Design a protein with these regions (language model features):
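Phosphate-group recognition and catalysis centered on beta-loop-alpha active-site segments
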Residues: 1-74
Length: 74
């Protein structure tokens, strides 16, 4: 069975698409589904229009740390 978290494994709404939620998801062996947007030439993780304080797609890949987990991107 494949388990995907939605915007990371968050415990409060403020954690959605934040580093802590992605670390929690990946550390438990869950993949994740999230959204990518572009702002000022960078790809960032954001469900809504980016505000400039989002983590970058590159940072998300660093959090994955080479783990072979599903990553569903919209």
């Amino acid at each position: 069975m494949i388990i995907l978290s939605h915007r990371g494994y968050w415990k409060s709404e403020e954690e959605r698409n934040q580093e802590v939620a992605f670390h929690r998801s990946f550390d438990l062996g869950y993949g994740t589904e999230t959204d990518i947007r572009d702002i000022q030439g960078k790809l960032v993780i954001s469900h809504d229009m980016p505000q400039g304080n989002e983590i970058t797609f590159e940072e998300l890949l660093q959090i994955m740390d080479g783990r072979n987990l599903p990553l569903a991107l919209n």
